[in-house]
C-alpha cells in the first residue's frame, strides 16, 4: 500500500485577510507595550514634581560621565533648584505653564497683564477659524488656573492642580492651540523654518496641536510671542565645552521662565 502523501498546508496568498489580522495583532501588541511604558513613566514621575535641590542631577549620570558632570557643575553656578516634569512629550507646555503661574503669585502687575491677554486669546483663535465650541472648555480651564493664582492660592494647591491629569492636560491643549494660532498668524515668517515641504497649517496639525508631540525652537518662539512671556532655556547635551548653552526667546527680552532642556525633555529651573 503506497504511503499517503503528506497533506500540504494550504498557504494563504499574499495580501490575504490572515496577513491583515497578523499586522493588526502586531500593531495592537506595539500599542499595548507603549501603554505599559507610559503607565510605568506615570507611576515613577508626577506630572510636575516638588521643587528639588539642583544637585539631584548629579545622581542621574555616572560619576565618570565628565561631560554631563561638568555641565551640571556649571549650571549650579546659575541655578539652585529644579522642578521636574513627566517625560510624556507635553513637558515643555506643562513646565512653562507651572513656572509662569507660580511666578505670578508674587507679581500682581504681570498677573493682570497676563490675565487680560489670556482672556482675549480665545477670541483671537476663533477669529482665525478655530471652533469656539471645541476650544471653550480648554480656555475655561486655563482661565480657572489664572484665577486660582489671582486668589493667592498656595504653591502646594497650584501644584495639586497641575498634577490633576484632566486639568493639567486641558492646560497643555490650550497652550498648544495658542502656539498653533500664533504660528499660523505669522505663517509668512515661520514657513521658512518648516521642513518637508509642509505648509505652516500642516505642520501645526501634525506637530503642534496633537498631545505628546515634542517641542522645539519654533514652538517656544511662538508661545513666548503669543503670550508675551520671555523664556530662557538652558541647553544641556553632549556637545563640547563644559557649559550649558542659554537661549532667550525672544532674543533680547528679560526672561520670566527658566527651563532646562536635555535631549527630548524640559524641566523647570530656579535661581
Swiss-Prot record:
Pfam family, any one: Peptidase_C65
In this chain, the stretch annotated as Ubiquitin-conjugating enzyme E2 binding covers 130-138, 169-177, 206-213
Q: Which InterPro entries match?
A: OTU_dom (IPR003323), Otubain (IPR016615), Papain-like_cys_pep_sf (IPR038765), Peptidase_C65_otubain (IPR019400), Peptidase_C65_otubain_sub1 (IPR042468), Peptidase_C65_otubain_sub2 (IPR042467)
Changing residue 26 to A does what? Answer: Abolished ability to deubiquitinate RPTOR
Annotated site, Interacts with free ubiquitin, chain positions = 221, 235, 237, 261, 266
According to the record, mutating residue 23 to S results in:
Does not affect ability to deubiquitinate DEPTOR
Q: What result is annotated for mutating residue 134 to R?
A: Impairs inhibition of UBE2N/UBC13
Ranges for the region named Free ubiquitin binding are 189-195, 214-221, 245-251
Q: What is this protein called?
A: Ubiquitin thioesterase OTUB1
Q: Which organism is it from?
A: Homo sapiens (Human)
Amino acid at each position: 500500500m503506497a504511503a499517503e502523501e503528506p497533506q500540504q498546508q494550504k498557504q494563504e496568498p499574499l495580501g490575504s485577510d490572515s496577513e491583515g489580522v497578523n499586522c493588526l495583532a502586531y500593531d495592537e501588541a506595539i500599542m499595548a507595550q507603549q501603554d505599559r511604558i507610559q503607565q510605568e513613566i506615570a507611576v515613577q514621575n508626577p506630572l510636575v514634581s516638588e521643587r528639588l535641590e539642583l544637585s539631584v542631577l548629579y545622581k542621574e549620570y555616572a560619576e565618570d560621565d565628565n561631560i554631563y558632570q561638568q555641565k551640571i557643575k556649571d549650571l549650579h553656578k546659575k541655578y539652585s533648584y529644579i522642578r521636574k516634569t513627566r517625560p510624556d512629550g507635553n513637558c515643555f507646555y506643562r513646565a512653562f505653564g507651572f513656572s509662569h503661574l507660580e511666578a505670578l503669585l508674587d507679581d500682581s502687575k504681570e498677573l493682570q497683564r497676563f490675565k487680560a491677554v489670556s482672556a482675549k486669546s480665545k477670541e483671537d483663535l476663533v477669529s482665525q477659524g478655530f471652533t469656539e465650541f471645541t476650544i471653550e472648555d480648554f480656555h475655561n480651564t486655563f482661565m480657572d488656573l489664572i484665577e486660582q493664582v489671582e486668589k493667592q492660592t498656595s504653591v502646594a494647591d497650584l501644584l495639586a492642580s497641575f498634577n490633576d491629569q484632566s486639568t493639567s492636560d486641558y492646560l497643555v491643549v490650550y497652550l498648544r492651540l495658542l502656539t498653533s494660532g500664533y504660528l499660523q498668524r505669522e505663517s509668512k515668517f515661520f514657513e521658512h523654518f518648516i521642513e518637508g515641504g509642509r505648509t505652516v497649517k500642516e505642520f501645526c496639525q501634525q506637530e503642534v496641536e496633537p498631545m505628546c508631540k515634542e517641542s522645539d525652537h519654533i514652538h517656544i518662539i511662538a508661545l513666548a510671542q503669543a503670550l508675551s512671556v520671555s523664556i530662557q532655556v538652558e541647553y544641556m547635551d553632549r556637545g563640547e565645552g563644559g557649559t550649558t548653552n542659554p537661549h532667550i526667546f525672544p532674543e533680547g527680552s528679560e526672561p520670566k521662565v527658566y527651563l532646562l532642556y536635555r535631549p527630548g525633555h524640559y524641566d523647570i529651573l530656579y535661581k
